[in-house]
Every structure is written in C-alpha cells, then in structure tokens.
C-alpha cells in the first residue's frame, strides 16, 4: 500500500513539527509539506497528489475556510 501524502499547515513552526513527529510514527503516512504559507500549500497540491491536509482554521491573515474552498476547487 502506498503511504498517504499529507500537508501540515499551521502558522506556528512548533505545532507543525509536533504534528509531523506524531505522523512519522506511522509508516503509512508521508508528510509532503509543512508550511504556514497558503500559496506554498496550493502550489504543492497543484503539483503533487495529496491525500490529506491538516489545516489550522485560525490562521493570521488567511481565511482558512476560503483556503479549503480553493483546495477543493483544485481537485475538481
């Protein structure tokens, strides 16, 4: 079975790192990107198949729900 590809998006680096450490314990998960930048996340999704996005909904300067809609529209 191919590992699930995951993006972690949170503005706090320590939160991103903590989530990644937890996910790395599972060999069926590959973290493709850790970022606090919505543009970087969208670029990654455009260029790579991603199975799951872990997204902080309280992002400074970014409407997380609008970002979710953009992500959904990329996959249509």
List each model region and its residues.
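Conserved acidic segment of CheY-like receiver
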Residues: 3-14, 19, 23, 53
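Hydrophobic C-terminal alpha-helix "anchor/cap" residues
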Residues: 23-24, 71
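Short beta-to-alpha connector loops in regulatory alpha/beta signaling domains
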Residues: 30-36
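Acidic, metal-coordinating helix/loop segments flanking the phosphotransfer/catalytic sites
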Residues: 36-52
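Acidic catalytic/metal-coordinating carboxylates
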Residues: 37, 63-66
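Short amphipathic alpha-helix used as the core "switch/output" element in two-component signaling
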Residues: 65-76
């Amino acid at each position: 079975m191919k590992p699930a590809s995951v993006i972690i998006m949170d503005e706090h680096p320590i939160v991103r790192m903590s989530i990644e450490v937890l996910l790395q314990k599972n060999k069926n998960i590959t973290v493709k990107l850790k970022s606090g930048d919505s543009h970087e996340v969208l670029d990654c999704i455009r260029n790579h198949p991603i199975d799951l996005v872990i997204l902080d909904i309280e992002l400074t300067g970014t409407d997380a729900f609008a970002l979710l809609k953009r992500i959904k529209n990329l996959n249509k």
